[in-house]
Each structure stands twice: as structure tokens, then as C-alpha cells.
Amino acid sequence: MAPVLPVVLPLQPRIRLAQGTWLLSWLLALAGGLTLLCSGHLLVQLWHLGTFLAPSCSFPALPQTALAAGAVALGTGLGGAGASRASLDAAQYPPWRGVLTPLLVVGTAAGGGLLTLGLGLALALPVSLHQGLEEGLQAALAHYKDTEVPGHCQAKRLMDELQLRYHCCGRHGYKDWFGVQWVSSRYLDPNDQDVVDRIQSNVEGLYLIDGVPFSCCNPHSPRPCLQSQLSDPYAHPLFDPRQPNLNLWAQGCHEVLVGHLQGLSGTLGSILAVTLLLQVLVLLGLRYLQTALEGLGGVIDGEGETQGYLLPGGLKDILQTAWLQGGLAHKPAPEEAPPDEEPPKEVLAEA
């Protein structure tokens, strides 16, 4: 069987291959560490923002996959650096001969597979982020008033912290608060005629007002924050509804969070692409180094040329050989014929 992608490697190219693989292995370990840091940071961000993501949103699968891929890439880089350095010394290389094959298999199957999957998720999942945040923020606004309802007691605090931290208001703008009841019913006076009229005028029996929570207010505004009667141009003569950003945060939280999380996922995707490229180069270098040294008995400075290759034969030949070897291994051995029995001694004596 002819080897796949054979390369003739004299002494100096073998040494340069080992040195180059050692350098690329350390770069791969560095890229794997950066992948771990970026995916861990994105996981922490999603843990804090999990309340505002719909349960059906699959975006958290990206940092989880990238975390596993970064760990495998880090291990492959460290193992490749040790193996390539040991290959320069005939006394240190023998212990690594049994490690290289499992390292190549794990690096190719697990590392390459996870990195490719993570890169694909980084390109595809940000699309689902829009819908996940849309549903999550809508639910957060609807449960803002439920401070005494089990399971939603922290909804008000989390939404206030979100708007104050990210300088946003509502889902797509401050007017989103006009369509939900964000004032708890325990603060409403049932004897107040205005409260009764507002509740009765709504089909769902909600108390809706044209106001926003205080967390929507911009503390850097040069004037006092106006929270109520925002749709009435005569209620606040100094307030222009066409320019609410003078008092309130102009952007909605959906736009801010999408930009923030997509920026993190874009950075993570770029690191995954670089890590995948380094992973391929390191695995190729280790494979050619392994096959070249096997032809020299594990001595890199052995005399003469040797041949490095990717596979000992074509995929069809490898599968055929494995099939034949497996068939021979399961084929029962031929039964030995029983030895001829010697005639009894009495018969021999009579003869």
C-alpha cells in the first residue's frame, strides 16, 4: 500500500520539523487557554443574564462547547510540546512513543470535532439569541410587579439592576413599560376612582400607566427625572417626548444585550478559528514527526533520509486490511486430528 501524502525528510528538515512543532504546540496551548478564559467569561455573563433568556434558547451551548474544546486544545498543545521536544533527544523519546498515537487520536477526534462544532455554533447560534432575549425580556417585564409571587420575587430587582448597569429601558424602548402593569397591586388603592377606571378600561384587568420605573432614569440628566405621564405633552412643559434621552435611557435592553453578547461570541469565534488552525498544524507536525522517527528507530539524528506520511495507505486499503485482520482473528483454528491409538499390548504379544 502506498502511503498517503509522503514527504522525504533528511536530517535538517527533521530537526526543523520538531522545532516548528514545538513552537506551534505552545501557541496552541496559549490559544486553548484563551479559549477557556473567553468561554468562561461568556458563561458567567449568561449566568447573570439567564433570567432574561428564554429557556428554549440554545445560545448557552456555545460557551459550554468552547470550554471543552479549549481544554482539549490546551492538553494537545502541552502534550505536543513535550513530545516534539523529547524527539530531539534519543534518550527522552522512547517514553513518548506510546503516548503519541493516543494523543493524535484524541486531538483529532475530540479536539478537532469540538473546535469545529464550537466554530459552527459561533456562526449559527447568535441568530437564535434575538428570539431568546425577546421572549425573556417580555417575561421579565410582565413579572416585574410580582414581588410576592413565588418564583418571581427577584424579578423587579434583577430588571432594575439590568437597566441601571446596561443603561437601557424596556425591551425596545421606554414605551414598552406602557403596555405592562409594573406597579404591584398591593400599592394600588382600590378606593381610588382613577385606579378603578384604569383597571376596568383594560380587557385583562391590568393597571396600565404611561410611566416607567426609576431604573430607567438617566442619572447624568441635567434635569429631574420624569417618570409618569410621559405621553401627555402638557403634563411636563419642559419635557419633549420626541427627545426622551434627556431624562431616560434611549436604548432598549434587547438591543444592548444582543450587541454585548454577540460581541463576546464573535471574539470567541475568532479565537476558536485560530485554535482550530493551530490544532491542525500541530497534529500534522506530530504525525509526520512520529512516522519519520519510526523509520529511524526513534533516533532523529540517524543517518540517511526517512519518509514521513499521513497514513500508511489509502482509506480503502486501511479499512480492507482491518477487515481482513478482524476476520482472521475471529476465524476458528483448524482442529487437530486425534493421534492414532496404539494397539493393546496383549494384541502385540499374540502377534
UniProtKB/Swiss-Prot annotation:
The chain crosses the membrane at residues 20-44, 65-84, 103-125, 264-286. PROSITE patterns: RDS_ROM1. Gene3D superfamilies: Tetraspanin. Disulfide bonds: none annotated. Residues 1-19, 85-102, 287-351 are cytoplasmic. One of its GO terms (cellular component) is photoreceptor outer segment membrane. Keywords: Cell adhesion, Cell projection, Disulfide bond, Membrane, Sensory transduction, Transmembrane, Transmembrane helix, Vision. Residues 329-351 are annotated as: Disordered. GO terms for biological process: camera-type eye photoreceptor cell differentiation; cell adhesion; detection of light stimulus involved in visual perception; photoreceptor cell outer segment organization; protein heterooligomerization; protein homooligomerization; protein localization to photoreceptor outer segment; regulation of gene expression. It is found in: Photoreceptor inner segment membrane; Photoreceptor outer segment membrane. It is a multi-pass membrane protein. Residues 45-64, 126-263 are lumenal. Plays a role in rod outer segment (ROS) morphogenesis. May play a role with PRPH2 in the maintenance of the structure of ROS curved disks. Plays a role in the organization of the ROS and maintenance of ROS disk diameter. Involved in the maintenance of the retina outer nuclear layer. Homodimer; disulfide-linked. Forms a homotetramer. Forms a heterotetramer with PRPH2. Homotetramer and heterotetramer core complexes go on to form higher order complexes by formation of intermolecular disulfide bonds. Interacts with STX3. Interacts with SNAP25. Belongs to the PRPH2/ROM1 family. This is Rod outer segment membrane protein 1. It comes from Rattus norvegicus.
